Amino acid sequence: MMKPKRLLSLLLRLIAVGATLAAVIIMATSHEKGTFFAVSYEAKYTDTPAFKYFVIANAIVTVYGFLVLFHPPGSPLWRLVLALDLVFTMLLISSISAALAVAQVGKNGNSRAGWLPVCGQVTKYCNQVTGALVAGLIALITYIILLLHSIYTFLNPLLEKA
């Protein structure tokens, strides 16, 4: 039988891997052809560097999360895992921030810069991007909870000795 703390950690890691994998799949499959004033164009995630960064960052975090699932519980390398959890949480924060900024401009445009919103013409694409961002945010929140749980688990024995 697993200890409750280990079970919680495993459950959070499974949720995080699922959410990052979903974010990658949803964003990587987002594309739609649209027409604007008789001009045809195709909206793809690869057209936007921030969306490419989002996919790459989430893919890296997915692989990391999957590998950590098989890490033995009693290993002394858990300190390294704790540090890497922090690094990958920051990677998720930066990629989601960049993608959210671009998505906001795509949805609302920017009147001062003369950028028109595109979501009215490519709604399926925008909905997929929104879904990927929601999955990414779920992964981020899960990683933050996991990080706090790991820090507490790591520091608790030290605090009890003091």
Curated annotation (Swiss-Prot):
<feature type="topological domain" description="Cytoplasmic">
    <location>
        <begin position="1"/>
        <end position="6"/>
    </location>
</feature>
<feature type="transmembrane region" description="Helical">
    <location>
        <begin position="80"/>
        <end position="100"/>
    </location>
</feature>
<feature type="topological domain" description="Extracellular">
    <location>
        <begin position="101"/>
        <end position="130"/>
    </location>
</feature>
<dbReference type="InterPro" id="IPR006702">
    <property type="entry name" value="CASP_dom"/>
</dbReference>
<dbReference type="InterPro" id="IPR006459">
    <property type="entry name" value="CASP/CASPL"/>
</dbReference>
<dbReference type="Pfam" id="PF04535">
    <property type="entry name" value="CASP_dom"/>
</dbReference>
<feature type="topological domain" description="Cytoplasmic">
    <location>
        <begin position="71"/>
        <end position="79"/>
    </location>
</feature>
<feature type="transmembrane region" description="Helical">
    <location>
        <begin position="7"/>
        <end position="27"/>
    </location>
</feature>
<keyword id="KW-1003">Cell membrane</keyword>
<keyword id="KW-1133">Transmembrane helix</keyword>
<comment type="similarity">
    <text>Belongs to the Casparian strip membrane proteins (CASP) family.</text>
</comment>
<feature type="topological domain" description="Cytoplasmic">
    <location>
        <begin position="152"/>
        <end position="162"/>
    </location>
</feature>
<feature type="transmembrane region" description="Helical">
    <location>
        <begin position="131"/>
        <end position="151"/>
    </location>
</feature>
<feature type="topological domain" description="Extracellular">
    <location>
        <begin position="28"/>
        <end position="49"/>
    </location>
</feature>
<keyword id="KW-0812">Transmembrane</keyword>
<keyword id="KW-0472">Membrane</keyword>
<dbReference type="InterPro" id="IPR044173">
    <property type="entry name" value="CASPL"/>
</dbReference>
<comment type="subunit">
    <text>Homodimer and heterodimers.</text>
</comment>
<feature type="transmembrane region" description="Helical">
    <location>
        <begin position="50"/>
        <end position="70"/>
    </location>
</feature>
<protein>
    <recommendedName>
        <fullName>CASP-like protein 1C2</fullName>
    </recommendedName>
</protein>
<dbReference type="GO" id="GO:0005886">
    <property type="term" value="C:plasma membrane"/>
</dbReference>
